């Protein structure tokens, strides 16, 4: 008889507690390949469905309203519809190596599309909030053959973006429209019409999906240059669900409040695949997930209604929930709060522990590790600020690397270095081989680009991002400790520190804060607060700038490039002020550049032709001391 863990052949009726490192090492004596019961994500969802066929797989809310009756899809119906979707894509010509991209909000058929695409070919979830040119770059880099997208609908511009990018997609054979009538003569098909024509009890292709087969391409990285596409195998993704269900003791019938995007591995794998493969249920808060203001506003009533064990999201959402008093809501079902995607500020973690009386399970990983790689093991003491220990069969090292990314040595306990990781979740490389330069250390250890340390007990502490360092006159300043100090100010809701250009030092630290609703600060108050609490004088921000809102990515991380561009604009505008004082119309805009990373564009307007070259020369002289590239444009 099968044990409690749907994805493990050997675990019996009780999960192991794994309370010590010795217990984990003993558990690992059995090879992982002998344990795992699913070779593909399709298998994993099927095994979860067998545990709870008539239970809810998805409970869909239209507007995060706990009083609404959700649309319920059972596990039996979900795996049937995934099978139909795979057959639909096969009928449209998709084979094992073909890419099915999708741009969808969190509607039920988005989840069906993700796993149907992986069963038919290769799924490629795309952030529909990106600009059309970025979407086109991703779809072309992936060689997209089929695109699934939301049809025309008020309040969303997804279809308009599809129409804009379609002419640029050389490999595209078909578009499938969710909530649309389609236009078959023009290669646009209605999802609802096509899927119902397909059998739900078998894969028509007869495909036997191997663990080594590519399951998905996830886009990652910044906003410039060729998009990085991370290749996940089915085995990579199944490991995520296997390990998290093991450590969090997944069981059929549990509910998870879900609002993460599917183009982020924290949503599609950490939460969705893990939940479905255990026979548990996703309570989908709305098509826009946590972005719907009702999701946070109604959070405690939603907890009372659906009784989840975990409050799980990105740190920005966790911080926002703290501003909503639970009142009389019964939130006793909650056993822990979990967050990842970026570091949970210690101030936020402490507030969760104090106000909600919940332990904080911080997780760490990246798209390249198929999401979570380390976490705070339940049952062991929580070390607030640490991201815990590697999951079973995974490993972490802290190392010193040379300028070419080659290994110099391993760091000692408590010594800060670069975090590198290996294990069953670690990807095999980016789709574009040019992106693999420097991605791995000794071929199997992925270079995270993060700085961290291991304490004496092997707990991982992330101390910063190598590229987030502020380098002041050759002195490396880690922004994380300064951000923590800013967070502790009672008026500060969110904080970030970046480098602003400086002609002498190269960079100087500058702080940005988003104040809590209704909060006010006096001029100089935040600067004084940080100065008094920062032992390292060079690390004190030269200025702390309140902004609203703080720029964030689609998954709630602070988008630091935007802050760096803003800081540079402020500096260069000040440097060019003498030209403005002479009546010259001079405007500075800093943004991304494909080759240089960032560039300052100085626009000179209304100059007589005989003065243009001379004034442009003055701009070049004034900006020459700065490292950032610049260009002058005449308007």
Residue ranges and their predicted role:
Residues 72-76, 215-239:
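Conserved AMP-binding A3 loop
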Residues 285, 336-337, 344-363, 367-460, ...:
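Conserved AMP-binding/adenylate-forming
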Residues 38, 53-56, 177, 182, ...:
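Conserved pre-ATP/AMP-binding loop-to-beta segment of ANL
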Residues 110, 130-140, 147-149, 304, ...:
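AMP-binding/adenylate-forming catalytic core of the ANL superfamily
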Residues 37, 54-107, 111-114, 131-136, ...:
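Conserved AMP-binding/adenylate-forming core of the ANL superfamily
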Residues 1-11, 121-193, 629-634:
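Structural core segment of the AMP-binding/adenylate-forming
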Residues 149-163, 286-289, 304-351, 359-369, ...:
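Adenylate-forming
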Residues 118, 238-255, 263-309, 324:
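Conserved AMP-binding/adenylation subdomain of ANL enzymes
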């Amino acid at each position: 008889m099968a044990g409690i863990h749907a994805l493990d052949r050997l675990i019996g009726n009780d999960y192991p507690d794994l309370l010590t490192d010795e217990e984990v090492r003993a558990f690992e004596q059995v090879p992982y390949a002998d344990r795992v019961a699913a070779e593909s994500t399709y298998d994993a969802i099927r095994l979860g469905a067998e545990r709870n066929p008539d239970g809810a797989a998805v409970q869909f809310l239209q507007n995060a309203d706990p009083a609404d009756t959700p649309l319920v899809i059972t596990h039996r119906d979900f795996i049937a519809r995934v099978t139909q979707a795979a057959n639909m894509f096969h009928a449209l010509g998709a084979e094992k190596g073909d890419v099915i991209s999708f741009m969808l909000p969190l509607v039920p058929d988005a989840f069906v599309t993700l796993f149907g695409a992986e069963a038919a070919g290769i799924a490629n979830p795309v952030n529909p909030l990106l600009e059309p040119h970025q979407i086109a770059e991703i779809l072309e880099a992936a060689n997209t053959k089929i695109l699934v997208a939301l049809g025309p609908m008020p309040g969303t511009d997804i279809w308009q973006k599809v129409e804009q990018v379609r002419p640029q997609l050389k490999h595209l054979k078909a578009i499938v429209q969710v909530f649309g009538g389609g236009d078959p003569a023009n290669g646009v098909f209605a999802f609802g019409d096509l899927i119902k024509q397909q059998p739900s009890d078998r894969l028509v292709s007869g495909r036997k999906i191997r663990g080594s087969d590519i399951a998905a391409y996830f886009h990652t990285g910044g906003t410039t240059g060729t998009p990085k596409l991370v290749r996940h195998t089915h085995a990579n993704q199944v490991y995520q669900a296997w390990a998290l269900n093991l450590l969090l003791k997944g069981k059929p019938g549990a509910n998870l409040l879900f609002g993460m995007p599917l183009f982020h591995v924290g949503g599609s794998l950490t939460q969705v695949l893990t939940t479905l493969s255990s026979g548990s249920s996703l309570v989908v808060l709305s098509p826009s997930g946590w972005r719907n203001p009702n999701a946070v506003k109604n959070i405690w009533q939603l907890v009372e209604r659906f009784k989840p064990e975990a409050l799980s999201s990105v740190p920005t959402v966790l911080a926002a929930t703290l501003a909503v008093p639970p009142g009389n809501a019964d939130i006793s079902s909650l056993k822990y709060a979990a967050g990842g995607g970026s570091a949970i500020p210690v101030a936020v973690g402490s507030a969760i522990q104090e106000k909600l009386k919940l332990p904080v399970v911080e997780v760490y990983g990246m798209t390249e590790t198929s999401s979570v790689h380390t976490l705070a093991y339940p049952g062991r003491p929580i070390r607030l600020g640490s991201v815990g220990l590697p999951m079973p069969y995974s490993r972490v090292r802290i190392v010193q690397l040379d300028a070419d990314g080659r290994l110099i040595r391993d760091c000692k306990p408590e010594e800060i270095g670069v975090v590198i990781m290996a294990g069953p979740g670690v990807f095999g490389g980016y789709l574009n081989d040019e992106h693999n330069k420097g991605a791995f250390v000794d071929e199997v250890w992925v270079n995270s680009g993060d700085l961290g340390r291991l304490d004496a007990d092997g707990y991982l502490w992330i101390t910063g991002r190598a590229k987030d360092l502020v380098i002041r006159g050759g002195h490396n300043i880690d922004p994380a400790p300064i951000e923590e100090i800013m967070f502790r100010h009672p008026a500060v809701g969110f904080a970030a520190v970046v480098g602003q250009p400086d002609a002498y030092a190269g960079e100087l630290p500058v702080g940005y804060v988003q104040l809590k609703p209704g909060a006010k600060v006096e001029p100089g108050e935040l600067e004084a607060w940080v100065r008094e609490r920062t032992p390292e004088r060079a690390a004190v921000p030269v200025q702390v700038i309140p902004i609203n809102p703080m720029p964030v990515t689609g998954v709630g991380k602070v988008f630091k490039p935007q802050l760096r561009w803003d800081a540079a604009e402020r500096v260069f505008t000040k440097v060019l002020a003498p030209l403005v004082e002479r009546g010259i119309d001079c405007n500075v805009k800093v943004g991304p550049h494909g080759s240089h990373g960032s560039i300052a564009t100085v626009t000179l307007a209304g100059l007589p032709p005989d003065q243009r070259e001379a004034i442009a020369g003055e701009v070049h002289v004034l900006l020459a001391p700065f490292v950032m590239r610049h260009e002058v444009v005449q308007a």
